[in-house]
Amino acid sequence: MNVKSIALSAVIATSFLAAGAMASEKTEPRNEVYKDKFSKQYDSWHATDESKEVVDMLEKVPSLVVLWAGYGFAKDYNAPRGHMYAVTDVTNTLRTGAPKNAEDGPMPMACWSCKSPDVPRVIEEQGEDGYFSGKWAKGGPEIVNVLGCADCHEKGSSKLRMSRPFAERAMTTLNTPFDKASRKDKQSMVCAQCHVEYYFEKTAERPGFVKFPWDMGTTVEQMEVYYDSMEFSDWTHAVSKTPMLKAQHPGYETWKLGVHGQNNVSCVDCHMPKVTNDKGRKFTDHKVGNPFDRFEETCATCHSQSKEFMVKQVEESKQKAQDLKARVETQLVKAHFEAKAAWDAGATEVEMKPILMDIRHSQWRWDYATASHGASSHAPAEVLRILGTSLDKAADARVKLAQLLGAKGVKQPIAYPDTSTKAKAQAALGMNMKTMNAEKAEFKKTLVPKWKEEAKKREATYK
């Protein structure tokens, strides 16, 4: 190449950089780019920031600390907020630790997977192998835009898409591939990219990859068999030594089991209805929320009953589930501590195995029924059924434990520690919350600002 050619190449390269790089061929993660073209949708989506309140669920239900002993949720668990807080909340939670650099911290990259349209952007740029490799902190400078347009829509379009390849594979597993689905089905499938049960693989070929456990089906029993068949556990319980499963948020699976799912009423129909603006134009309201807040556009399009009647029905279903949920939690807390007493008394692994399996199955079913949040509305009968089987499993475990403790000469009832508050429960487990909170504060003060600065510089190169 001669001098003139080299000079010309340099000019072309410089011009390209000056013009800016594309965010991604398929994904524009910056939600504000769509503000003008889709103004009504953008403004309503932005209104999800109104759910500002942080509700500490461990304060409200201290038994959760014991149920998740040894797992990150025992440190910190708040009620979910609007989509606008997805990145903020995963950054602030104690569950993601206080990493000091990109290679540090307790959690994998997969923890970002449902938080941002930057996730599909990075997957497109690096492949799934590149995206899923490494620690959660590696993604800090990359995953900065909150859940929004590109998570559910094709670039520059209102057309729906599956932006996560692991979710697309899961739909194919159910013989319902996204590209063959109706628009009505797609309106729920895009939500099912995140509002589902999933786990992080532990295989050598796909370490830390997100997978939906749907190979045998989507019911609580089918997924239980799936997990048991490969002896998978999310963690070992710090008190009972049970190989535990942590349900995420199986909203899609429980919706499918209820009257709405079985009649093809989509997530969008109830949570993102068509509304009319002040100019008389209809659009899809992207302020994802409670259907009762927009009753005339949601429930009233199918139901003839009054809002008051419908609210009462839902509240009664919710209360029944809450009452049964609390009973299960009481039994499981005691089962975990009784299992510890059995171990301390010299119980063997052979003696404990069936007991731990009962505890595992009971808590998995309890978590499946409650972690999906809206399941008592989506599938109230199924939730009560599942919680009933959970209570049975917890009772089975405690009966076996009573027999084993008696055989070991342990006086019953055993002495249970005071777990009546979040602080007392965490103290009973030996958790140093003062240190954890101080480390988290330092992380937010030192590393997070660097992430934001790196992201700002990167996005400044985009067109």
UniProtKB/Swiss-Prot annotation:
GO terms for cellular component: outer membrane-bounded periplasmic space. GO terms for biological process: anaerobic electron transport chain; nitrate assimilation. It comes from Shewanella frigidimarina (strain NCIMB 400). It is found in: Periplasm. Residues 1-23 form the signal peptide. Binds 1 Ca(2+) ion per monomer. Binds 5 heme c groups covalently per monomer. It catalyses: 6 Fe(III)-[cytochrome c] + NH4(+) + 2 H2O = 6 Fe(II)-[cytochrome c] + nitrite + 8 H(+). It holds the Pfam family Cytochrom_C552. Heme c 5 binds at H260, C299, C302, H303. Pathway: Nitrogen metabolism; nitrate reduction (assimilation). Heme c 4 binds at C267, C270, H271, H378. Keywords: Calcium, Electron transport, Heme, Iron, Metal-binding, Oxidoreductase, Periplasm, Signal, Transport. This is Cytochrome c-552. PANTHER family: CYTOCHROME C-552 (PTHR30633:SF0), CYTOCHROME C-552 RESPIRATORY NITRITE REDUCTASE (PTHR30633). SUPFAM superfamilies: Multiheme cytochromes. The keyword Acetylation does not apply.
